[in-house]
A protein has these predicted regions:
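CBM-like, beta-strand-rich accessory domains located in the C-terminal region of large
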Residues: 84-390
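Histidine-centered active-site/metal-ligand motif
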Residues: 10, 57-63, 70, 99-100, ...
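Structural recognition of the beta-strand scaffold that forms the well-ordered cores
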Residues: 36, 49, 67-69, 74-78, ...
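Extracellular polysaccharide-recognition and catalytic grooves
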Residues: 1, 19-63, 74
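Short, P/G- and charge-enriched loop/turn segments at secondary-structure junctions
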Residues: 8-9, 23-25, 53, 88-90
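Accessory C-terminal segments flanking Radical SAM cores
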Residues: 57, 73-80, 85-88
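Short, small-residue-biased leader/transition segments that mark boundaries at the very start
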Residues: 6-21
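Residues that flank catalytic or metal-binding motifs in active/ligand-binding sites
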Residues: 17, 31-33, 46, 62-64, ...
Length: 390
């Protein structure tokens, strides 16, 4: 029944009203590691789908991979599939290289997992859907634990931008690369990549750990991400297609990756969000300005498992929090302290001066929206919750 719903929309004459059957725009199928988030159930709406679960046989080596449908096109796509007896299935389509994942020293999940399975599976957690703000966490550490001790991928969808935050740590120093399988015309413009297919268009904008090198003269930008074009078989096996790898030149064993995927309303849209990279003591983040709204996004560098027996408190821009990540939105021309819209990921408190905006006995995932005297909350994290809000 589930697969019928996923593949084919039931006719409106079915027993259940269409609007009732598809009431939720987000769904987490935690047992087998799927999550879907969409902005509506209208035709050609935008959908983000994330996978992080078991690997074996039909379930590919794609922990933490994702696809995006936008205006009827899988604009960020999966590498595909082919007839099982063909060597391309086991050599490419099944493997991590055919999916939108992070590789370390050129390696993804061990290739033998196709036949022996992944002893440690991937997981998806903490799905939140508050309309224009959605979130899910993918933990793909287990399937790549031969190289990684942390392989977390956060998806934070705010308005018309999907922010993908990678929290990565490996057992040894080496090189990281991000894979992108696109379905459309690929055009690099400065630090952005535009992908367009008919009326569907997105911008891929890497922001951390580095920007994309601004020009093709990558030797002028030795610390920035450089790109590689890789040829792979098409799904029909009649030719080849190109996918892309963004390489970090530095050899490290811990990195935070932050990529913005901007969902354009039309291919010619020029009014795109302005994003300013910002950093402070023990945090990195962004200030996003668009359509009269400012959003400040903070990522806590102390809350990634590096501390033991100490709290991960940071004080960015006058805020005080132990949250792994938080965002605050407010109208342009006003002050952040008067904000009413918050996103908090794995935090127990948010304070500013003598004011407590949020306090909990356990760390939670929270979206808060306030208007007039109405307060809307979406909370995930503990079976029993004891918390207060301003």
């Amino acid at each position: 029944f589930f697969f019928f719903l996923m593949i084919r929309r039931p006719p409106r004459s079915t027993l259940f009203p269409y609007t009732t059957l598809f009431r939720s725009t987000s769904q987490l199928f935690s047992d087998f590691g799927w999550a879907t988030m969409r902005n509506s159930w209208e035709k050609d709406a935008t959908m983000l789908a994330v996978k992080s679960g078991h690997t074996w046989n039909h379930s590919h080596a794609d922990a933490n991979s994702f696809i995006i449908f936008h205006k009827g096109v899988d604009i960020i796509k999966d590498g595909g599939n082919c007839w099982y007896p063909n060597p391309a299935y086991r050599n490419y389509f099944f493997q991590s290289q055919a999916h939108n994942v992070v590789l370390f020293n050129g390696e993804g999940q061990p290739r033998e997992q196709q036949y022996s399975g992944s002893t440690l599976r991937g997981y998806l957690y903490h799905l939140l859907d508050a309309g224009n703000v959605k979130y899910v966490l993918a933990n793909g550490t287990g399937p790549v634990s031969n190289n990684f001790s942390r392989n977390f991928r956060h998806f934070l969808w705010m308005d018309d931008v999907i922010y993908m935050i990678d929290d990565l740590k490996t057992h040894k120093v080496g090189r990281f690369e991000w894979l992108w399988h696109t379905n459309g015309t690929y055009k690099k413009s400065g630090v952005d990549v535009n992908v367009t297919n008919g009326n569907s268009s997105v911008v891929i904008r890497p922001l951390y750990p580095r920007l994309l090198a601004k020009s093709d003269f990558v030797h002028d930008y030795p610390e920035d991400l450089y790109w590689e074009e890789i040829q792979a078989p098409t799904e029909d096996l009649k030719g080849t297609e190109t996918y892309y790898s963004f390489h970090l030149p530095a050899e490290v064993n811990r990195v935070k990756g932050l990529t913005a995927i901007i969902l354009k309303d039309t291919p010619d849209e020029k009014d795109l969000p302005q994003m300013e990279r910002r950093e402070g003591q023990d945090w990195i983040g962004l200030r996003i300005r668009h359509k009269g709204k400012v959003t400040d996004l903070y990522i806590n560098q102390l809350a990634d498992g590096r501390l033991m027996h100490s709290n991960s408190w940071i004080m960015p821009d006058g805020w005080m929090t132990d949250a792994y990540m938080f965002a605050v939105s407010y109208p342009e021309g006003t002050e952040a302290k008067n904000a009413k819209d918050f996103f908090i990921a794995y935090g127990s408190a948010l304070r500013r001066g003598n004011e407590t905006y949020f306090s909990s006995l356990a760390k939670l995932f929270v979206i808060q929206k306030a208007e007039d005297k109405k307060l809307d909350l979406w909370i995930n994290g503990q079976p029993k919750i004891n918390t207060t809000f301003r």
